[in-house]
Amino acid sequence: MFEFEITSNCSNTKARTGIFHTPNGKVNTPKFMPVGTMATVKGISSKQLTSTGSEMILSNTFHLHLQPGEKLVKESGGIHNFMNWSKPILTDSGGYQVFSLAKLNNISDKGVEFKNPRDGSHVFLSPEKVIKIQMDLGSDVAMAFDHCPPHTANENDIEDSLQRTHSWLEKCIETHQKSNQALFGIVQGGKYPRLREYSAKFTSSFDLPGIAVGGVSVGEAVEDIHSVINYVPKFLPINKPRYLMGIGSLREISLAVANGFDIFDCVLPTRLGRHGTAFLNDERLNLRNARFKNDFSPIDKTCKCETCKSYSRAYLHHLIRNDEILGLTLISLHNIAHLLRFTNAISTAIKDNCFTNDFAPWKTSSIAHHTW
């Protein structure tokens, strides 16, 4: 039911193209996943999301457990029916909230007790409970519960959290009983090569349908991010999809693909879009800026998204300056389409044998310019 088919390999790097087959369709890799934390990509309908070329989205177990609750989602027919999205969905386990809500939680080997950010009530999540929630949600891919420590933690504390992550993975595997849902394990270990190697080998030993690398882009130096991207893949199985969590910048995606990663997610396209910032190649345009008031060109003349085909920078500037909801929708749509266009261009470049780890196809001097 779940199969990862490698369709081409790059002769210059470790990049590859592939197809990840799921019960709700296939994902052509490398591929960016838009983030729909609450079973919605903020401000965008499922139909609009389809128009961007999105093939898989991410939702969050922790937040959906709090509201509306997994039982209601299951009663609706599962998360696909609930949000009217027929393509693959991956649910994050809530491990990131162990990091982001650190001041509101208490961690033990059994799980994490959270203070509900909505009403202050106490919520306990164990690895077993996290898996049961995801089984009720009915996502295509469930993530194992992991402990994502802050990047400032010392090596001993990182190692302690790693042992917890590995113990939780074993409990997740024991609990997971859903044949039409894949379970991915998560590699942790901070910036320490010894711990990353240990975690990658441990996680790989279970022969799961896919493997993720977490604890990246959580405030650490760019050099540390690149070190993990360069180092970890050599310890991961070649025949499984590799998911690099929380990465959405073009430079890091390009470097990650060059090292053999396949799937990526990030909130930046919609977070920046909601504040009026649009992607243009490797630039970011703040459309709130007065210089766009009389600019009647699209965000990107080469982009075929609905926003660029239909609206000018001047109109988007007007919407954002007047806090019109349509503005955040249109810019978010473009930003998502831009990242998907980028990963699609990478795929073409790999197949045409012109991909490099500093991929920038919008430059006319690039040998991969035809992919853009």
UniProtKB/Swiss-Prot annotation:
Cellular-component GO terms for this entry: cytosol
Keyword flag Chaperone: no
GO annotation (BP), single: tRNA-guanine transglycosylation
Coiled-coil positions: none
GO terms assigned for molecular function: metal ion binding; tRNA-guanosine(34) queuine transglycosylase activity
Record's cofactor remark: Binds 1 zinc ion per subunit.
Pathway as given in its UniProt record: tRNA modification; tRNA-queuosine biosynthesis
Gene3D superfamilies reported in the protein's UniProt record: Queuine tRNA-ribosyltransferase-like
Residues spanning the membrane: none
The keyword 4Fe-4S belongs to this UniProt entry's keyword annotation: no
Catalytic activity: 7-aminomethyl-7-carbaguanine + guanosine(34) in tRNA = 7-aminomethyl-7-carbaguanosine(34) in tRNA + guanine
Highest taxon above the source species: Bacteria
Keywords: Glycosyltransferase, Metal-binding, Queuosine biosynthesis, Transferase, tRNA processing, Zinc
Enzyme Commission (EC) number: 2.4.2.29
Family that this chain belongs to: Belongs to the queuine tRNA-ribosyltransferase family.
Subunit details: Homodimer. Within each dimer, one monomer is responsible for RNA recognition and catalysis, while the other monomer binds to the replacement base PreQ1.
Descriptive protein name: Queuine tRNA-ribosyltransferase
Organism, as annotated: Prochlorococcus marinus (strain MIT 9215)
